[in-house]
């Protein structure tokens, strides 16, 4: 199959090069969104076949099977989070030529006369928050985001402020390239909340000041369980455990027995690319992790309240790093359960507070056919010595 993928703007009077007009003139089968069809309909041959690109896409590609050559219209640059990428994934052996125009974020930057060579681009179009969360935590100074009807500018602004990211201003571009409907608004995040914008739209976030990004958060800074500092992993131990987990190289992290969420929060701040799932049996943990993630600006940590041994984990992404901060007297059984999900090359780190739990961990690791890679003993002030032990 051969595909010609033509990028276009949202302008009703959209113009095309002579090469593209010649291509359209001899084309037989065309495809694109309903808006694209409205704009180009008068330029197509009378006997043209048109295939609407709508979800589910399986039906679209089923129709494509009947034709050897298809001309596809897409918005902006079809290779920028666009339909050309979908074609490449679905039909990797198909021949393709792309005719791009400026994508929407480029166009918005042009309207602002804003250099965008170092802009971090994220797509929220049918996608989770992960990439935007990562950009905010990293402190990227310029972020361009593609929106959809669910993740609107208002909802994005509200979520940013919920987690303390008031250090950006937002510019929203609406119907960019459409001479009759285009709008550009630069606003504070507070001004964006509750405001409705025409669709399609996109936005650029410009950092107004550098937000503090902590490393080694003091225990006293967290909201604590009944005010008890002894119930939180101490900063030196927390950082050593995270170091032994080697999270630079990992993708999915499970934090078992999160209590205040300190380990998950520290991990998210230093390794914002991680998918983190945190587990806690105490109901109070829900309030604590909600308070602390918002205090320290760590959106995206998924938490699960209940006995880890009774939770159904089958729908969660399998971990390649696991921290055990609490085991409720079921350490041996917990290791067996973790072993069923831990990806090849993954590791576990356990903070042992007693000789008995250290012995149980060693024996439990041996029983599941794994081995101890490293262990370090640390004593903080007048607290009991902790052994941080890693298994692979």
Task: Name what the model sees in each region.
Residues 1-6, 18-19, 69-70, 140-230:
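A contiguous loop/helix-start segment that scaffolds small-molecule binding in enzyme catalytic cores
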Residues 1-97, 106, 273-276, 280-282, ...:
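Class I S-adenosyl-L-methionine
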Residues 9-12, 79-139, 309, 359-380, ...:
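Class I SAM-dependent methyltransferase SAM-binding "motif I" and its flanking Rossmann-like core
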Residues 250-259:
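Conserved class I S-adenosyl-L-methionine
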Residues 260-272:
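Conserved SAM-binding loop of SAM-dependent methyltransferases across substrates and taxa
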Residues 289-292:
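Conserved SAM-binding loop
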Residues 335-347:
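A short glycine-rich, Lys/Arg-flanked "PGG" loop and its adjoining helix->strand segment in the class I
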Residues 345-353, 357:
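Conserved beta-strand signature within the Rossmann-like core of class I S-adenosyl-L-methionine
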